[in-house]
Amino acid sequence: MPLARNMPKNSSPLEKINTGNVKKLSLAWSFSTGVTEGHQAPPIVNNGYMYVTTPNAQVIALNAVTGEELWRYKKEIPADLLMLHNTNRGVALYGDKVYVGTVDSHLIALDAKTGKVVWDATVGDVKALSYITLAPLAAKGKILVGSSGGETGVRGYVAAFDANTGKEAWRTYTTAAPGEPGGDTWPAGDAYKNGGGSIWITGTYDPASNIAYWGTGNPAPWPTEGRPGDNLYTTSTIALDVDTGKIKGHHQYHYNDAWDWDEVSAPVLIDTNINGRKVKGAVHAGRNGYLWMLDRQPSGKLDFVNGISYVYNDVITSLDKTTGRPSYDMSKKPGMGKAVSFCPSLWGGKDWPPEAWNPKTKL
C-alpha cells in the first residue's frame, strides 16, 4: 500500500478482507511485549517485518507472518525521566532505517534489519522538560519530530533532521517571537518562551505540495491572565515547507485557549467538491467540538470553508462566516479564582486519535 498516497486520508484501498469474510478471521499468533502499561503505538509492517514500540522506549521487530521476535532495541532512560510521560506512539520507516523518538528528547535511527543504532540525535533539552511521545514523520529525505510538554512550560516546535546523517536541518517554533509574524498575539516580555503549543501527534505530509501539516497544542500556562492575545500558533493547524520549515499558512481553531483544548490531530487531506467548487480540503475534528473544513491553497495558505459542531458546545456561540474565528460565551471561560463548568470538557469532543476518510463512499 503506497503510504504517501493513503496516509493523508487514513484509508486503505485493500479489499481482500471485507464485510462478507471478516467473520472467518482467526488468531494466527500473539505476542507479549513484556510491558503491562498502556501501548499507544500501532504496529507498522514493511517487507515482512512488523515494528512495535512500547511505553519504556523499546522498539521490537517481529516476523509479521510468524510473530517471532527478530530484534529488540531499548534505550536506557532514568526512571525520573520516564515519569514525565512514559508514552511512545510509534516509529517512522524510511529507506533501510527505523526512526523513533524518546522521552529523553532524542531521535534515533536504527537499522531496519538488525536494530543496530545508526545515529542518535539530541532534539530538545530534557532538563527544560521537553520530551518526545509522537511517531516521527518521514518526508523528502528528512525526519520530522515535535516537542511534547505543553503542561511543563516548553516552547513547542517541529524540528527536521537529515534521514541519513541525523544532522538538524531546521527548527520551527509554534509560539511566535516579537518581530515574527504572529508575535503581536503575545504580550510583551517572555511569555512566548514558555507558551506551549506542543506537538505530540504526528503531522500529515502532502508530497504534491511538499507541505507538512501539523496540529498544535494548547498555550501555556492554562490561566490566560498572563498571556492576553490570540497566542499564535497554538491550537492551530500549521502548514510547513518541508525544505525550509517556513510556516506557509495556518488556521487557529480557537484563540487564547483556557480549556486545554489541544488541536494536535493532523488534518485528513481530501479532494472534494463543495457547492460545485473544487476544494483541496484539510479536515480536522477539533478537540473544541467542531468539525472543520479548510481549503489548502498551492501557496500553503489555509482558507476557512466551514465548521460544524459535532458535540454539544456551550463555549463557542458562533463562527465568523469568512474567517471561522469563534465568538465565546465569556461566562464559560475559566480564570484565576474563577471556577466554571463548560462543555465539551478538557478532554474535548475528540482527543488525539485520528480521523479517516473513505474516497469511495465519501464518508
Give the ranges of each region predicted by the language model.
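A detector of repeated loop/turn-to-beta-strand junctions in beta-rich toroidal repeat architectures
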Residues: N56, D104, V154-Y157, L232-T234, ...
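Blade/loop signatures of beta-propeller domains
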Residues: M1-L27, T174-P181, P326-M330
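Residue position within the beta-strands of beta-propeller blades
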Residues: V52, V100, I143-G146, W214, ...
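Extracytoplasmic beta-rich repeat domains
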Residues: F31-I44, R72-A92, D120-A135, T152, ...
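Structural signal for beta-propeller blades
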Residues: V59-I60, L107, V158, G203, ...
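Beta-propeller blade signature
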Residues: L110, T114-G115, G156-K167, D230-K246, ...
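N-terminal cofactor/phosphate-binding cores enriched in small/glycine residues
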Residues: K9-V126
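Short coil/turn segments that connect the beta-strands within blades of beta-propeller domains
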Residues: N47-Y49, G95-D96, K140-K142, A208-N210, ...
